[in-house]
Regions:
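A conserved beta-strand element that flanks and buttresses the S-adenosyl-L-methionine
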Residues: 152-153
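Conserved beta-strand signature within the Rossmann-like core of class I S-adenosyl-L-methionine
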Residues: 176-189
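Short, glycine-/aromatic-enriched active-site segment of Class I SAM-dependent methyltransferases
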Residues: 189-206
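Core SAM-dependent methyltransferase catalytic element
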Residues: 236, 240-266
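Short alpha-helix
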Residues: 206-233
Length: 266
């Protein structure tokens, strides 16, 4: 099979770094997280992953957030087995294949250049399908089946958007879905403008421009929503490195960790 050569840049290119991190870790001994699809597909891509391979800061963060997000999404699906999930800025994410209970409906939404790569690799249809659109396109909800409680997963995106852009993205969800629940990954505020700490991300040209330490920090960005829970990826890091467990609940550690903010439409 001829390898697929992705042509991406900036924030869109960061999806390749995250994808590689999941594949690399899944091949490691005694891994606490396994992404079978990433392992299967990584060698089909014609892309220089050297920077991602050596960027342990980025890699550990990706695995920790994957562990915690799998837990959060899995819990939602367990409570709502016929739910609809919209994965915004999906990149090459494979969570559907780990979460599928045979009943959920799952949409992977991203920009045209990303969906083009994704469609070549996955050829998704049926209960899992793609939506080729910007998260700011007010028409994308027309392509989504509305049924019961709706979960919107926003991973690896908010930190690359301005507050105004994040507000616009969330307003589209708010204005179109009455039973909307959102899990939104946010950069801790102390890391805004510090993308140089993740060398593979820095080399894509993407910038960390937005962060929030809690739902309350979102303010008008999440207008029309109410808090369900503030969470973070600390326990994911502890699963990777159990030696960190004694420090898990230290305020300083929790403040610096990537946040998982869970909220719903009022």
């Amino acid at each position: 099979m001829e390898k697929i050569k992705p042509t991406l840049n900036g924030a869109a290119e960061t999806m390749l770094q995250s994808f590689y991190a999941r594949a690399k870790y899944s091949k490691s001994k005694n891994c606490k997280f396994y992404d079978a699809k990433a392992v299967e597909i990584v060698d089909k891509l014609d892309y220089d992953f050297d920077d991602a391979h050596s960027d342990s800061t980025m890699g550990n963060g990706v695995i920790a957030r994957s562990i915690v997000l799998d837990e959060l999404v899995g819990d939602f699906i367990k409570k709502n087995p016929d739910c609809v999930v919209v994965n915004i800025a999906c990149g090459l994410d494979t969570r559907f294949y780990r979460m599928d209970n045979g009943r959920i409906t799952w949409y992977n939404l991203d920009l045209p250049e990303t969906i083009e790569v994704r469609d070549q690799i996955y050829n998704e249809h049926g209960r899992v399908s793609t939506i080729c659109a910007s998260a700011f396109d007010p028409s994308w909800p027309e392509k989504v089946t509305v049924r019961g409680k709706m979960l919107f997963v926003i991973e690896g995106l908010s930190m690359y958007l301005t507050a105004e852009e994040n507000a616009k993205m969330l307003s589209i969800i708010r204005d179109n879905f009455d039973n909307a629940y959102v899990i939104m990954e946010c950069l801790a505020k102390k890391w805004v403008n510090k993308e140089d700490l993740e060398k593979s991300i820095q080399k894509t040209g993407a910038k960390f421009v937005f962060g929030a330490d809690s739902f309350d920090d979102l303010g008008d960005v999440a207008k029309g929503f109410e808090k369900v829970k503030d969470d973070n990826i600390t326990r994911g890091m502890v699963k990777i490195y159990p030696i960190l467990k004694p420090f898990q609940n230290l305020p300083l550690i929790n403040k610096a960790a990537q946040k998982m903010l869970i909220f719903r439409k009022k």
